């Protein structure tokens, strides 16, 4: 289902990756340009279904579920303002307004963001993004969807994370850990495990990496990262092994994997088919006639 929703949901950097929005250009009477992002309830529904799927799929993880476009846009606006107030780079939101079942998010056109050439990133760039997200985490902000598409640069080359719509504030330790694992798994897929862990040791320290080991598992990695050319089934095992080497032996042996996934898509569909099969059998048995008998 994760892979399927990737084809249903589309987003652009112009409005900080609002899923399925309509984009317009606007100039005020002074000629100042703005980006106008309109999100309709009907278009937001696919994003809402994806949130619900994550809520069902993940255990012990807080997941947003914004039923309306208005709720989603208001939250996104608040997130961007909050991240900006931390001194972190974001696109500049101007305001938000609602009309019927649609919500309008207005952003300053400048500075503009462009997709980051991930292959061209340096170790310093990796450390910069790791410290960026760590600053957000210290104040309770989590992104919750760190993929290659969330990495962007401003006109002056400043590297930052975009797409805060599904993030949240007052986040718990599990969501903080998952953010870091999303970033680690992305970098490990693109740059390799050794290079990624070396950068993370400088940015976060060994203690943080050791505490992340129980969360390094497939359920924590976005489908978009698992679709990258550098991904393979052994990558997370290599990442856990390299991170475990940082811990004393007695600590490493005591670190048990946290249960994040209630079930996978295969078991979900198997349960669905089982329910359908039971329904068919019961129908064929004609329960009404059995009751009368």
List PLM regions with ranges.
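Membrane-interface helix termini and inter-helical loops of multi-pass transporters
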Residues: 285-292
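Internal hydrophobic scaffold segments of catalytic domains
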Residues: 10-42, 186-215
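Soluble, non-transmembrane catalytic domains of enzymes that act on hydrophobic metabolites at membranes
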Residues: 7-13, 109-111, 115-117, 169-170, ...
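Regulatory N- and C-terminal appendages and interdomain linkers associated
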Residues: 1-17, 30, 220-283
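C-lobe/activation-segment region of protein kinase-like
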Residues: 143, 154-226
């Amino acid at each position: 289902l994760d892979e399927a929703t990737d084809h249903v949901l589309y987003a652009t950097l112009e409005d900080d990756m609002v899923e399925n929005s309509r984009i317009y250009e606007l100039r005020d009477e002074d000629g100042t340009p703005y980006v106008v992002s309109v999100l309709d309830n009907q278009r937001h529904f696919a994003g809402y279904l994806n949130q619900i799927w994550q809520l069902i799929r993940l255990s012990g993880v807080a997941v947003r579920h914004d039923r309306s476009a208005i709720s989603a846009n208001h939250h996104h606006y608040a997130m961007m303002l909050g991240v900006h107030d931390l001194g972190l780079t974001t696109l500049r939101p101007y305001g938000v307004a609602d009309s019927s079942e649609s919500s309008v998010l207005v952003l300053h056109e400048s500075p503009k963001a462009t997709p980051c050439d991930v292959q061209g990133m340096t170790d310093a760039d990796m450390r910069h993004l790791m410290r960026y997200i760590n600053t957000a985490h210290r104040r309770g902000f989590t992104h919750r969807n760190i993929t290659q598409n969330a990495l962007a640069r401003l006109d002056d080359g400043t590297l930052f994370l975009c797409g805060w719509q599904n993030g949240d504030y007052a986040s718990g330790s599990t969501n903080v850990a998952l953010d870091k694992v999303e970033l680690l798994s992305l970098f490990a897929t693109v740059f390799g495990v050794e290079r990624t862990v070396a950068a993370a040791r400088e940015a976060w320290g060994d203690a943080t990496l050791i505490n992340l080991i129980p969360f390094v598992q497939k359920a924590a990695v976005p489908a978009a990262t698992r679709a990258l050319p550098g991904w393979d089934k052994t990558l997370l095992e290599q990442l856990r092994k390299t991170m475990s080497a940082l811990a004393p032996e007695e600590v490493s042996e005591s670190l048990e994997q946290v249960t994040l996934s209630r079930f996978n898509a295969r078991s979900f569909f198997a349960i669905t088919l089982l329910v359908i099969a039971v329904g068919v059998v019961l129908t064929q048995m004609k329960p009404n006639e059995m009751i009368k008998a």
